[in-house]
Amino acid sequence: MDNYWKGKTICFLGDSITEGVGVVPGERYFDFLSKELGFTACGYGVNGARYVDLYEQALRMKKEFGSNTDAIFIFAGTNDFFLNTPPGEWFNYAEEDVAALKNDDGTPLKIETRKVRQFNFDTDTYKGSINRLMSFLKHNYAEKQIFMLTPLHRAYAEFGPLNI
């Protein structure tokens, strides 16, 4: 079957679901997709991984493949939830002097102090860890497709008292 993914190389970052814990070798979710769609799959999932750990997976992927992957899938978040990783913030705010007005050659005519958003890279938080990972991926794989899958719904899971 000809399709967009045939002959491509796709890397998968994630936790035990991506690693394939509890399934027969060759029956991870992306193994089925690979067989059906004809792409080469490279799995980097590690049991128990949180978003902070996916950065190491991305470094390993970069070392092994360079930029020779066509797409990257990220499937994580369950362990962050289970282990009560604080959500954190996407951005920090700071004040910065900026050119509010420039002349035709770009020389600043007026400088003002303005509030700016800066990405939060605090790896003790869920959002900071995602920012760190995505910053690395976007800088190293700017022309590649990156897919983020949300954590599985766990209707009957028993998490800690800080999780709702």
Region annotations inferred by a language model:
Residues 1-67, 72:
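Serine-esterase "nucleophile elbow" of acetyl-processing enzymes
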Residues 59-164:
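Alpha-helical cap/lid subdomain in secreted, periplasmic
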